[in-house]
């Protein structure tokens, strides 16, 4: 489904007592992280992440390197059956990786040039949480693209494709930082 369709029992899934109503997905896709049954959730951080999922809010989690910020998001997503993709910004990721690029592909056994969408257009059109990892290490040209997406009603325009992708609210997608 394109929208969360299953009420989640926060006490059962996260061992958290709260009146917050959160929905996840009934079915699991290949993009849903595996559940670590030994994972222990921090209540305040978990509630912030859950609010991001439920109310289409961007969430930033800060802390020292290696303290499990991204893993925390992935474990929340796993229990919601919510697709989640981690994008490491300290690697060689480019604007083209995020937005898309022309590529040579085979169609009817012939090579043709075709625009292949990047991770951002794909994530806007599908219910997926993006985890921008190592945010402080992102290159300026990459961060400029991400900044537009992180705005409350973010807009992504693909000029080469004459396409404008808009967030709608409430949205089946969440961008989690």
Feature names for model-found ranges:
Residues 1-169, 173:
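AAA+ P-loop NTPase catalytic core and its hallmark functional loops
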Residues 175-177:
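N-terminal low-complexity segments that are often proline-rich with Ser/Thr-Pro
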